[in-house]
UniProtKB/Swiss-Prot annotation:
It holds the Pfam family RecA. Its main location: cytoplasm. Can catalyze the hydrolysis of ATP in the presence of single-stranded DNA, the ATP-dependent uptake of single-stranded DNA by duplex DNA, and the ATP-dependent hybridization of homologous single-stranded DNAs. It interacts with LexA causing its activation and leading to its autocatalytic cleavage. The gene is recA. Residues 328-347 are annotated as: Disordered. GO terms for molecular function: ATP binding; ATP hydrolysis activity; ATP-dependent DNA damage sensor activity; damaged DNA binding; single-stranded DNA binding. It comes from Oceanobacillus iheyensis (strain DSM 14371 / CIP 107618 / JCM 11309 / KCTC 3954 / HTE831). Keywords: ATP-binding, Cytoplasm, DNA damage, DNA recombination, DNA repair, DNA-binding, Nucleotide-binding, SOS response. This is Protein RecA.
Length: 347
């Protein structure tokens, strides 16, 4: 056994000499740190994700039908990363980002890195360069379906390009996944939905870009519009249902329902009321909502308006919910020295 131990020690030293310190280690040598997160900007989604936000150093896919709120969900994550002092990048392959709307959601558009690439290859090369810099906290690619391979753009309109996009995504994710993990960048890929032809049984819906993204994603979110929110006869927003279809960092298949208000984004007041009343933090008696024996309002919209006007009450309920789900028990982010060291390691 001693010969085997000696041989193993020699092999480990050789590996560390060749590939650098930390390239291989025993799991029990160091305390395994909790996964650091970036808040999603939605309390309900933070709860559904199980760890209080999107995991750092992982790939996340957000997909769903058109106008369901996918980009809104991603922009809220960018806003939260910027609030923590992080750097964010948005790769707009669809050329459809509305800076006015992004600003309304809390995104600092002056500091946001924006790229509108011509081809899929260019978009993914830009993403790789940003990740390898080690200086970007979150990257959003909108969308995978719009990452058109160069050969398809330069070809004729009727030409067949079978599997080109799938091969492009597969190759890109093979190169990106390791760098994303080392740099602790959260990479969010927004995707659309397509329907398979001739499917008689089962779900005919699929996402473009092949299967690679499904495999490499640690979290997959399905966003669907549940109903239209109205104030009188006027539509003021949508209720979106977000399902955690895949989760490698916490139990999957949880759901979050959020109010996405037109021009304003996710309503924090609405989700605090819903979750708070489910946990009996906010008491509901008939149509009346109350907190600590103080009435918030009659009807959901009036209670939301009260919370909007009394931010200290909203914050208090918000913190009580986070404490109930133990969402604040996450290790602190790495120091600047460690981040800069990781940047050097990646180069």
């Amino acid at each position: 056994m001693s010969d085997r131990k000696q041989a193993l020690d020699m092999a480990l030293r050789q590996i560390e000499k060749q590939f650098g310190k930390g390239s291989i280690m025993k799991m029990g040598e160091n305390e395994i740190p909790k996964i650091a997160t970036i808040p999603s900007g939605s309390l309900a989604l933070d709860v559904a994700l199980g760890i209080g936000g999107y995991p750092r150093g992982r790939v996340v896919e957000i997909y769903g039908p058109e106008s369901s709120g996918k980009t809104t969900v991603a922009l809220h994550a960018i806003a939260e990363a910027q609030k923590q002092g992080g750097q964010a990048a948005f790769i707009d392959a669809e050329h459809a980002l509305d800076p006015v709307y992004a600003k309304a959601l809390g995104v600092n558009i002056d500091e946001l890195l924006l790229s509108q690439p011509d081809t899929g290859e260019q978009a993914l090369e830009i993403a790789e360069a940003l990740v390898r810099s080690g200086a970007v906290d979150i990257i959003v690619v909108d969308s995978v379906a719009a990452l058109v391979p160069k050969a398809e753009i330069e070809g004729e309109m009727g030409d067949s390009h079978v599997g080109l996009q799938a091969r492009l995504m597969s190759q890109a994710l093979r190169k990106l996944s390791g760098a994303i993990n080392k740099s602790k960048t959260t990479a969010i890929f927004i995707n659309q939905i397509r329907e398979k032809v001739g499917v008689m049984f089962g779900n005919p819906e699929t996402t473009p870009g092949g299967r690679a993204l499904k495999f490499y994603s640690s979290v997959r979110l399905e966003v669907r519009r549940a109903e239209t929110l109205k104030l009188g006869n006027d539509a003021v927003g949508n209720k979106a249902r977000i399902k955690v279809v895949k989760n490698k960092v916490a139990p999957p298949f949880k759901q979050a329902e959020v109010d996405i208000m037109y021009g304003k984004g996710i309503s924090k007041e609405g989700e605090v009321l819903d979750i708070g009343s489910d946990l009996d933090i906010v008491m509901k008696s008939g149509a009346w909502y109350s907190y600590n024996n103080d009435r918030l309002g009659q009807g959901r919209e009036n209670a939301k308006q009260y919370l909007k006007e009394h931010e200290e009450v909203l914050t208090e309920i918000h913190q009580s919910i986070r404490q109930h789900y133990e969402l604040d028990k996450v290790d602190e982010d790495k120091t600047e020295e460690e981040a800069s060291q990781e940047s050097l390691d990646l180069k």
